[in-house]
Amino acid sequence: MALESLKEVARKIAGSSSIDKKFVEEMVKEIQRALIKADVNVRQVKEISDAIKKRALSEDVLPALNAKEQILKIVYEELLRGVGEGLEIPLKKAKIMLVGLQGSGKTTTTAKMAKYFKDRGMKVAVVAADTWRPAAYEQLRQLAEEYGITFYGEKGEKDAVKIVKNALEKLKDHDMIIIDTAGRHALEDELIDEMIKIAEVARPDYKLLVLDAAIGQLASKQAQAFHEAIGINGIIITKFDGTAKGGGALSAARQIGIPIAFIGTGEKVEDFERFDPAGFVSRLLGMGDIKALMEKIERIASEEELDPEAFLKGTFTLKDIYKQIEAMNKMGPVRKIFEMLPFGLGLKVDNDVMEMTQEKMKKFRVIMDSMTEEELLNPKIIDSSRIRRIAIGSGTSPQEVKELLNYYKTMKNLMKKMKKNKLPIKGLGKLGF
């Protein structure tokens, strides 16, 4: 992922024995390398690195901090200044128009955004106004059906403006209407004319440009062209997890002064989040994003109507994992949870646990169905002979049973660490931890 190496910079600062001029200069070089590798605009790289170096060598250490904490604070603040502002779309009635080039992930983003707002209590509808790509109508219809979202489209209709006009009439009772428009390989006149006409008819509250993170610094040229055409007021960066060039899209947004509204960090519907600059930079440095984690937990706990008592009483068994496994599926891979915790709380976790999938979670349920009540309540008694019996009974292998036990131990250790570090873990109790 873009800017991943910044975590190593933060670790070196936190683990350094002394902070001197030589250390600062080397640290700044590493930050420069990380930013350039992520395709951040060279001018912006110089601005950020110069500011960090100047402040690190000249500012007095604040009374409440030590030298390492002061340096981390400076790096954090200057990177935060570098990523620019975020755009928070409030939970109220609004029309949103998505634009972008072909292949940017616009249609998928339309559905993900609709699900995002639906999960937060809004009545949402999506409009299929991409009449150029034959598969766009069916793709959006299927995604809307999967996520339980109102869909409007007119199969075979070539007039996108007419579709939008009819949709607005039919969807008046919805809180949010999200319009998916046509994408192109380039900004052709015909596309620009259609976008302008749709914007005139829809009068959207938000015109959001969808940018593929993989295009790097080319994002700046695209963003400027769309902005001049219809006046975009927000950006969504997609596929941020799958490229080393995501910094280019971030710097493009800052260059033209357009805030980032959302970022897509994976293929799943839950891999879509509001862009919070402070939390984003904090995660880049491996310092976590507790606020985002708590928000996610509170929402999922509310959806699942989970009882926090088990964890709050200090108990955590395999039975708790069984009951709350669906909620964990919604949280996403363990890796994504750890990214929201400061330096992963120092826990060493196997890759197979980090990349826990829904398929694996389902298999865990089958394994637990073959356990006795005593084993579920007291996993410590599960020895090698019990593991063999459980594997045979569940139609799995002893290795898979061990994976479940390893996952259980990891999550239990995580909770202990969070309690020890006095992190706000009450919300985690709602997931049965």
Curated annotation (Swiss-Prot):
It is found in: Cytoplasm. The gene is srp54. It catalyses: GTP + H2O = GDP + phosphate + H(+). Its EC number is 3.6.5.4. The keyword Ribonucleoprotein applies. This is Signal recognition particle 54 kDa protein. It comes from Archaeoglobus fulgidus (strain ATCC 49558 / DSM 4304 / JCM 9628 / NBRC 100126 / VC-16). PROSITE patterns: SRP54. CDD domains: SRP54_G (cd17875).
